[in-house]
UniProtKB/Swiss-Prot annotation:
The protein's name: Glycerol-3-phosphate acyltransferase
Similarity section: Belongs to the PlsY family.
Chain's gene name: plsY
Keywords in alphabetical order: Cell inner membrane, Cell membrane, Lipid biosynthesis, Lipid metabolism, Membrane, Phospholipid biosynthesis, Phospholipid metabolism, Transferase, Transmembrane, Transmembrane helix
GO molecular-function terms, A-Z: acyl-phosphate glycerol-3-phosphate acyltransferase activity
Length: 198
């Protein structure tokens, strides 16, 4: 059984990994406009893409994914699967609410995939497949994430991973909360599509 102290340490490690704002760092290095002042105001890869810099968007996506994966793997190797779950939650919350940016972070899609990759990679592949299918047919990044994240806990439960299903259900609720403005724009027909510049 995981001790409370180890759980807190694993969570803290995850939070520190997750709070690294790759989108902000990379766009500042590249000299582009402040991400928080364009498009959705999000610091993630989709908003970086709206700057027209596809390479930066790809690098942001990879960075935001791998910080979640790294947090899970480090905690898992040091203290086991229960610690990996604590680190996954920490990494996701770190991305959503980074202390370095006054707790105003991204929406969590890439980090969601990253923690899934570290916890149970087939579910990460399933998430990506659903995301790509919806994105290809609708060109809405937000809708793709909402549908893929809704399906993920159900898939994990069906595959016999109730602990992971519960964790991902919590992450999904947080992801939907961070997408609440996107949901309103989707309902009104004003949501920006993938590839549209700010």
């Amino acid at each position: 059984m995981l001790s409370s102290a180890i759980a807190v340490i694993a969570f803290a490690i995850g939070y520190l990994f997750g709070s690294i704002p790759f989108g902000m760092i990379l766009t500042r290095i590249a000299g582009t406009q402040d991400l928080r002042s364009i498009g959705s105001g999000n610091i993630g890869a989709t908003n970086v893409l709206r700057t027209g810099r596809k390479g930066l968007a790809a690098a942001t996506l990879v960075g935001d994914m791998l910080k979640g994966t790294a947090a899970v793997l480090v905690a898992g190797l040091l203290w086991g699967s229960a610690a990996a779950i604590a680190a996954a939650l920490g990494a996701f919350l770190g991305h959503l609410f980074p202390v370095w940016l006054k707790f105003r972070g991204g929406k969590g899609v890439a980090t969601y995939i990253g923690v899934l990759l570290g916890l149970f990679w087939p579910a990460a592949l399933a998430f990506c497949a659903i995301w790509l299918l919806v994105a290809f047919t609708t060109r809405y990044s937000s809708l793709s994430a909402l549908i893929a994240s809704f399906a993920t806990p159900l898939l994990l439960w069906w595959l016999g991973h109730p602990q992971l299903a519960l964790l991902l259900a919590v992450l999904t609720l947080l992801l939907w909360f961070k997408h609440r403005e996107n949901i309103r724009r989707l309902a009104s027909g004003s949501e920006g599509r993938i590839g549209a510049k700010a």
